[in-house]
Amino acid sequence: MEGYLNPINIFSEIGRLKKVLLHRPGEELENLTPFIMKKFLFDDIPYLEVARQEHEVFASTLKNNSVEIEYVEDLVSEVLASSVALKDKFISQFILEAEIKTDSTINILKDYFSNLTIDNMVSKMISGIVSKELKNYVSSLDDLVNSASLFIIDPMPNVLFTRDPFASIGNGITINKMSNKVRHRETIFAEYIFKYHPIYKKNVPIWFNRWEESSLEGGDEFVLSKDILVIGISERTEAESVEKLAISLFKNKTSFNTILAFKIPKNRAYMHLDTVFTQIDYSVFTSFTSDDMYFSIYALTYNSSSSKIHVKEEKARLRDVLSFYLGRKIDIIKCAGGDLIHGAREQWNDGANILAIAPGEVIAYSRNHVTNKLFEENGIKVYRIPSSELSRGRGGPRCMSMPLVREDI
């Protein structure tokens, strides 16, 4: 992007958004059934036609605010179109990571993918493949035992949530180790984009890689300033990963000198930190707390002389911890004002999962009307988007977007 030396430039959660990564909802949502949706981390089945309409409103809202949009499927297709050898390598890796065991099935799939246009191939990899789509396919015992019901290759409906497979931090990224097996293949796309795409293969250091043993997901990664990160320890991100990321950032002499680890309960409703906590203005955050939702906070700093990380538990309240490290008074708007009924309802429907597109300007689901009204009463400009279908995947505007470039603040 013109005006930036690096293709990744993220030093805040709220700087004016210039470039973002999305995924267009596709046929993968049509391959969800009541019998398998829990396995694929969905609580209900979205209606694709309406989900697409809602997502287009989201994309249009971004474009109307001068945000450039990249689509993950387009970037991967551009990479694979550059080299037949690279395309073949990608196909082989994708099939391997789909855990196809028998040579006959592997060869059938290689032929099938190779004969599709690149755009259609990427689309089919995301949407999944059932046996009736392949000529000459005969399932082996091993394929049947390791297959999910009808699928030779499982769908990847969570690609919709581009926030999680990788995260932009400073001028670099983390390519994440996903917590759930059904999401592991999503990070292949990030691997190829940042290894081979002409825009992204240079000047983008990788702080954490997808082959790590412990899990890390983008919904738990927050860049509060050029000095401070917040990382959630949650249902999806492990404490070991926070320390690994801290070591990587500190030893590479980045600008980040403090990582605040926010431990939250391991609970489906609070799968990532960004389901209960986001920044919406310079000094304003939104959060959700309840009897079973609370924050334990730890500060990680680096002693360069001993090359060791120092960990300190913070005993103060969330607001006071943020005020201390950011050096200014902080206000926290509780989801639905802390109302026991509306707060729980709106948190479940991503009332705290807000995407800031500029300081004090956010995109939010229209259904969370109590929280949105509170934002506006506190001077926040809210762009409302419809979400009757998108919200069925338990992800809001922040989950559905990965910022690539923000203006520095």
Swiss-Prot record:
GO BP term, pick one: arginine catabolic process to ornithine
Subcellular location: Cytoplasm
Pfam families listed in its UniProt record: ADI
Primary localisation category: cytoplasm
Domain of life: Bacteria
Sorted UniProt keywords: Arginine metabolism, Cytoplasm, Hydrolase
Residues the record marks as active site: 399
Record protein name field: Arginine deiminase
Enzyme class: hydrolase
Listed pathway(s): Amino-acid degradation; L-arginine degradation via ADI pathway; carbamoyl phosphate from L-arginine: step 1/2
Enzymatic reactions: L-arginine + H2O = L-citrulline + NH4(+)
Molecular function GO labels: arginine deiminase activity
Enzyme Commission numbers on file: 3.5.3.6
CC terms in the record's Gene Ontology section: cytoplasm
Transmembrane segments: none
Similarity field: Belongs to the arginine deiminase family.
